[in-house]
Amino acid sequence: MKILRPPFRALSDENGVTNTFFTVYVVELALRMSPMPISVQRKESGDAESVYQQVRQALEQGQPRLLEMTCEKVEGKRLSVLTSDVLAVQIYEKTAASGGSKRPGFSLDS
């Protein structure tokens, strides 16, 4: 018997085969004048929600300030961004099963 602890999750397919997937939570920022978003990953849902709320509160205050974030997935990855340049923030769950195929949000692709 295998004991799984978060962020691992076991899923069974229609044939009864059990697969284990690693879940990571992504906090993604859309920046002014930048075509590509920046993101940091968290291993726990609560930690990702905390980062999301931190960014959201900084946006609500309306005062430009420097916001620094670190990434749990990529060791040593650090981001510093001026809050006045952040246009949007989103949080989503990513598993090994979903890979990097399509991010949540709006898309012009059919």
Swiss-Prot record:
The protein, known as: UPF0367 protein sync_2587
Lineage of the organism: Bacteria, Bacillati, Cyanobacteriota, Cyanophyceae, Synechococcales
Organism annotation: Synechococcus sp. (strain CC9311)
Family: Belongs to the UPF0367 family.
